[in-house]
Amino acid sequence: TQHHCQGSRKADDPVGLAAYGMDSHNVQRYVDPNGHVRNEGDVEVGGFSPYPISYRAIVPRANECANLLVPVCLSASHIAYGSIRMEPVFMVLGQSAATAAAHAIDESVPVQRVDGDKLHQRLRSDQQILKWTGQVRSDQPNLDSARLLRTRSDHIGISNHAAGR
């Protein structure tokens, strides 16, 4: 939710981090009475630290659907999804979902009953970052999600958009 993005709530079962500012592109453009083109519906909220995304966000309730993981169509408010929608976040959540699926198969349980401690242990052993321990520079409050995506070679990509360039 927006509360998680802005740090007023913390996920107690994280499977990855996101960090992009919450944004939503304009709904339409119109010409105002003075003849100026204006955007309507722009949303831009930033200035928060990287935040954890809950396992519960990628797993539908058992009474709704069994054994489905949704790392892209996850449960989030439309404002929070403006932050989560970045490809590096989807890649992290996809990896976490695959790890959870493997655990569910190995333990013969539905994904809703995967042992969270075992899942977190495996994600950490795979070098998944589940908790942000770094600091946010005051001149660059919107850290790019790509900084949180680490591969075995530690190669990362940085977007200029997040820094406002």
Indicate where each model-derived feature is located.
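Flavin (FAD/FMN)-binding glycine-rich loop and adjacent Rossmann-like elements that form
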Residues: 1-125, 129, 133-150
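Surface-exposed loop and adjacent secondary-structure segments within mature catalytic domains
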Residues: 155, 160
